[in-house]
């Protein structure tokens, strides 16, 4: 197995070459790393990334939620959210905040499992977990161009709408909400 890893490093080089132990270890690590991991960011990382994206004239879309029991309605919602800009950043409620919002016994899936699944979706570019009761501070830090929420927010005050340039409300898919379960 070690020889195969070393061969994997060497074939990527030009001409006759050798592989150092560090190169082999790094190569093995890259084989075991999921691309989803690269899309889950810390607050500091997402702030730096959003600044960089804006400098490249990318339109940033932000949404947030618990996304505890992922279903087709969530996927459609996220696909629609992504269509409003170039990059979709999803603020994911921490386990503590999901319990506070939905009650004991929730979340069903841990914050890391939820983040991993969401980051694997084509529509979601980045996931950042937040522990506050609302995403206001996160939205303030990112300063998205577009803030997206579900259609159930129609006629209601949306946290962070004073920060984003634009607010979009997306209708839910009938029969697909797990908010009351």
Task: List the model feature ranges, each with a label.
Residues 1-26:
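Conserved post-catalytic alpha-helical subdomain immediately downstream of the catalytic base
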């Amino acid at each position: 197995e070690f020889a195969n890893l070393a061969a994997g490093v060497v074939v990527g080089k030009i001409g006759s070459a050798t592989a150092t132990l560090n190169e082999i270890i790094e190569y093995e690590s890259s084989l075991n790393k999921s691309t989803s991991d690269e899309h889950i960011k810390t607050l500091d990382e997402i702030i730096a990334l959003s600044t960089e994206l804006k400098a490249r004239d990318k339109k940033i879309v932000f949404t947030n939620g618990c996304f505890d029991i992922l279903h087709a309605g969530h996927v459609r919602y996220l696909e629609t959210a992504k269509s409003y800009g170039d990059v979709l950043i999803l603020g994911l409620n921490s386990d503590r905040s999901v319990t506070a919002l939905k009650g004991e016994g929730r979340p069903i899936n841990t914050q890391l499992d939820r983040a991993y699944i969401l980051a694997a979706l084509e529509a979601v570019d980045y996931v950042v977990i937040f522990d506050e009761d609302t995403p206001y501070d996160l939205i303030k830090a990112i300063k998205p161009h577009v803030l997206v929420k579900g259609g159930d927010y129609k006629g209601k005050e949306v946290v962070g709408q004073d920060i984003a340039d634009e607010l979009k409300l997306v209708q839910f898919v009938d029969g697909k909400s797990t908010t009351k379960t």
